[in-house]
Amino acid sequence: NPNRIIGNQCSEAHYDACRQIAEEGIVLLKNTRNLLPLDTKKYGKILVVGENATRSLTKGGGSSELKTLYDISPLEGLKALYGDKIDYAQGYESGGAHYDKIDTIPVAVQTQLRKEALEKARKADIILYIGGLNKNHLQDCENGDREDYNLSFGQNELIAGLAALKKPVVVITFGGNPYATPWIDNVGALVHCWYLGSES
């Protein structure tokens, strides 16, 4: 039926199961000085940086694409928990979730996004970086393998720049494959979330 609403097979039970699987599947890889869970009394200004904080990771990738009634982004979830303590900076741009091509992002755009993120980070008490892989071509997508182990779109440089500010940094990544972590010694915590579905 071409007129069927996408996600019409979903139920609250599906979303409950998705949330439980997500909670149990997240992996804590580093947690220096018990930075996590966040002590909300300690941090008045929490900056979230990274495109994956707002990007729908249920879209794209070929056959791994999900058809859901709604997604809850990490940023929406954090705002629900911490309210107006949360600020956001995109930090980088990856383009659309295409199956067989990559959008060309001008260097000036990436430079400006990184600059804006670093400016906001200087005013924050703690930084939550939400990035990693996505469902774009040459990422976690059919019809094209990744070309190297580095995080794309200048993410390693952005994370290194955030860590250089000497503030607590939590790196939260999404993705289904391994990646290089040249900044690991300079961040306080690393959490890997895989792909969590509609209840990210």
Where are these regions (language model features)?
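Conserved, charged catalytic cores of large soluble enzymes
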Residues: N1-G7
